[in-house]
Amino acid sequence: MTQTLSQLENQGEFIRRHIGSSAEQQKEMLATVGASSLNDLTQKIVPRDIALPEPPDVGGGATEQQALAELKAIASQNKRYQSYIGMGYAPAVLPPVILRNLLENPGWYTAYTPYQPEVSQGRLESLLNFQQVTIDLTGLDIASASLLDEATAAAEAMAMAKRISKLKNADRFFVADDIHPQTLDVVRTRAETFGFDVIVDKAEKVLELDGVFGVLLQQVGTTGEVHDYADLIAQLKQRKIIVSVAADLMALLLLTAPGKQGADMVFGSAQRFGVPMGYGGPHAAFFASRDEFKRSMPGRIIGVSRDAAGNTALRMAMQTREQHIRREKANSNICTAQVLLANIAAMYAVYHGSKGLKRIAGRIHRLTDILAVGLQKAGFTLRYKTWFDTLTVEVADKAAVLARAEKAEINLRTDTYGAVGITLSEATRRDDVIKLFSVLTGTDDKLDVEALDKELMTESHSIPASMLRSDEILLHPNFNRYHSETDMMRYMHRLERRDLALNQAMIPLGSCTMKLNAAAEMLPISWPEFNELHPFCPPEQAQGYQQMISQLSHWLVQLTGYDVVCMQPNSGAQGEYAGLLAIRRYHESRGEGHRHICLIPSSAHGTNPASAHMAGMTVVVVSCDKEGNIDLVDLREKAEESGNELSCIMVTYPSTHGVYEETIRQVCEIIHQYGGQVYLDGANMNAQVGITAPGFIGADVSHLNLHKTFCIPHGGGGPGMGPIGVKAHLAPFLPGHSVVQMDGLTEQRAVSAAPFGSASILPISWMYIRMMGSQGLKQASQTAILNANYIAARLKNDYDVLYTGHNGYVAHECILDIRPLKEEFGISEMDIAKRLIDYGFHAPTMSFPVAGTLMVEPTESESKVEIDRFVDAMLAIRAEIGKVAKGEWSLEDNPLVNAPHVQAELVSDWSHSYSRETAVFPTLETKANKYWPAVKRLDDVYGDRNLHCSCAPVSDYQ
């Protein structure tokens, strides 16, 4: 044997697992694009003045086994105390059937946001279930398919209240004083940039105020009191004040729906429906509204429509409200939400059904009653007379109680003067209540659970009669069919089969970076060491998290060329918002708060102008030249015109047009010359890592899409993570947190509910970087560039590649111009996108950043075989367009305009001018491995004109 021990140890094994093409395949591809090596190709494409001499040092790579062992040792430093802190977070029980078949299933977690509904019907149905749960429990008319977290939802409710308010001169937003503190923190952050005056007081005090456009109430206060706000809401409605209510999804199973009491909006966290606390996330927020306000709602909304055959089909409705279309005029900057977590919550409701859910809520409440009465009989005073699951217990010797709790490995809420807080959960059992009683009393007296249970069956008054829910909920068959594990498993599998995810085919979406989410990266998110921690637990109990976050932050600092990284933003859009806030606060600290203009190239992603608007900035668009690059003449003119009002520029690199702009350093210099800051959008970081870096280029701040470049899966539309890196001068202006103070958090207000955002998915990115190492990360970027150029080279004779760099190359993605084909032959980018489904592919990004185009991003994870399959499909489709051009098929009847084709058409009457085989088996590969779309092409116009965003009525099933 001629190999050394080092070679046999195979430390770089994961690199070869992550990168799809072999060395031999890469040689063939390099020859096609005219390069001798990956380094040669990189030197031909990347401007020399921004190229790093060596990749940043994040260490060597590790095997999967080594990295998992290292991370397990780190995770074991976390202390898994029983948490009764509450404050919007509670232990939850995720049924194993959902854990295995959804959360740990790549068929669910590797899908993309359902912009292509024909290949997304499974998760669209699940999201419709989520909306139905929200509608039923809140008592309102329409719901969204998730927001980022409860605190963000509160901020969105405030913004929406202002949009829909008829009191146009009012600028005050009133918040009841027993809202969760982290929610108030985020609301204040948003209000600051909108110029709203936030007033916090006891709820009834709002009636004494003028100039109030909206009110935020919390049905179950943060310290446990259950409020009947029906009368107050009625009085507020008489004054035309918009009312939002924060609600607990578990409590709503027993409590009157706020919508029935007159609330205009109801929101909260769905975490308690089977999603672990995870040190703060990810968790789906729910959001519901009255029907009359639906076009002002934030977030994605799933609607019922029909397909080309007239069959019922689902789609994302009313997209004209959203950032990718309305840009700075959008209702919100939300792009990625929390689809995977919403689907978990929806399946939790499906599995338990109405009776099961009420049983769980009833058990939580009964145990709370038992503990409450037991403590009262032992001489304790409860601060409130009403509760669902949370007690605020007054204690004479708080230090002694907390010492006993520490010894028993129990966390209580400690921030209430002269009292401790206790929130029970689905995970609480009678032995836990007995243990809590002993901790509080400090005696050997044992709580008599059985006796108190009998007493409380007839005499519990902790929920006022007026607040008890009396209506039926979750009557739809989906919540009443799948209560055995066999049925539930099959239901989830049936939905999974309707979707096209990375476990079946390449998803070549430009600007989305749909790369491998390796199994080894995903394993740690199911570990209890990461799952069970409350985000507000004492820092000494989260040492494992702190070490993991510190290491990941250090690696990201190295890779970006920045000085500090903040992990709080829980999506890319939130990262943009946080970065722009840092810029705003920096200018204010220098007495330059008048700087408010944000320059944005015309090619920018829609979140950029939407985020700038949210940050209180004025958007000024900078033109691009005919090559797709930022027009430096126009940029300088706009910067000079802005003068001392220039705040920043938001620029994506490589550009959204898919090229490395040669003048990026000049762009940075011009902005700095006029006193502005450079925000470099990290959406295309997959073409930078190890090759260049935003801090090295000259930028001041960037967000990083960990769900793109650093392997967190898209989850069908979330979760995401958008940490921001900044230069040292912006570091003091990064987000802080009102509840948790520790190293890494500033004194600024928060942008997310939890101090470290969706912390429990950060191990995915930690694993990726640890296993790839410095050289592996650079090789990944280089391979992504190679794959994109290989596609462009193979397709350029049949499709126009819209933009290239000065030497004819693209970056990590390429834009195919379909406009000439549409003008000459009548075939659109939509027709090609839908026809690709028949070939077994998800479509590239349509009409972004240029209308009438397809943007293709293959990533480094796809093999040459799969890339060739995609190229061959595109060439075959071009040949089909040729048949239309020659008149062999009419423009009205051909396999492109009729695509996609469904299985039922094989056994239906066939009147088309092309064969069934041409329709559904266009290649030999599709005969061997066919993906069948569940529906034909969606009728978008019908869906928006006949908006229906809940499950079909029960009568349809009778």
Curated annotation (Swiss-Prot):
Its cofactor is pyridoxal 5'-phosphate. Keywords: Oxidoreductase, Pyridoxal phosphate. The modification N6-(pyridoxal phosphate)lysine is found at residue 708. It holds the Pfam family GDC-P. GO terms for biological process: glycine decarboxylation via glycine cleavage system. The glycine cleavage system is composed of four proteins: P, T, L and H. NCBIfam families: gcvP (TIGR00461), PRK04366.1 (NF003346). The glycine cleavage system catalyzes the degradation of glycine. The P protein binds the alpha-amino group of glycine through its pyridoxal phosphate cofactor; CO(2) is released and the remaining methylamine moiety is then transferred to the lipoamide cofactor of the H protein. This is Glycine dehydrogenase (decarboxylating). It comes from Photorhabdus laumondii subsp. laumondii (strain DSM 15139 / CIP 105565 / TT01) (Photorhabdus luminescens subsp. laumondii). The gene is gcvP.
